[in-house]
Amino acid sequence: MRNINAVFLKQVKETLKNKSILIQFLMFPVMVIIMENAVKIDDMPEHFFVKLFAVMFVGMAPLTCMSSIISEEKEKNTLRALMMCNVKPLEYLVGIGAYVWLMCMAGSLLFAFCGDYSGADFFVFMLIMAIGILLSELTGAVIGIFCKNQMSATSVTVPVMMVFSFLPMLSTFNETIEKVAIITYSQQINILINGLGTTDIKPESLIIIAANFLVSAILFVIAFKKKGLE
């Protein structure tokens, strides 16, 4: 537990130094504040930008941050130094994961406030965001572990991130894309957020999210056993 706390605090201290990571945490929360207050269009669904950017935030920020942090520290041999200080690989990953998850959940609070969620809807919204963020973290960790350096991680992260963050938005305009996107967790997060307070949660959404989690967990185990953090 002490090592996990040390890794967590290390990342917190480096937040302001790592501008690319900081931008990921702040970009969509800042955008939603601006767009919700600056753009008013007739017949626009209530809190349209909150729902749109919340889903994009889930698909982009945690995934990008996890892959970037892991691959960067592998490249700089920071991980090797941590291993020599008796920090176990899983302790490192839990520490990094907790840091990214909490930072993203802080951003989720801004989405919740901008969306005027209250009572049960607030807690359900935060739960949906928490699950989506965790899934994206797993995916980002797989990429970070598999890739040798930050450049190769970025080349893999960008297309994967675009799939999970942009498919839900594109699916609203194209039925064919919607049929493809339906199997992704980010699209199910999109469905759950847009139906919050108006429709019941469908079992299909929970099954697809669970299936996505299982696939991500299996890939994580494979990546960790094959590559480790060396």
Task: Show where each model-derived region lies.
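N-terminal Sec/SRP start-transfer signal
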Residues: 1-21
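Short alpha-helical transmembrane interface motifs in multi-pass membrane proteins
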Residues: 59-64, 94-95, 120-128, 173-176, ...
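Hydrophobic alpha-helical transmembrane segments of multi-pass membrane transport/permease proteins
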Residues: 14-41, 49-65, 156-168, 207-217
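Alpha-helical transmembrane segments and their short interhelical loops
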Residues: 89, 97-147
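Short hydrophobic, aromatic-rich alpha-helical segments embedded in or entering the lipid bilayer
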Residues: 2-6, 172-207
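Hydrophobic alpha-helical transmembrane segments of multi-pass membrane transport proteins
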Residues: 46-111
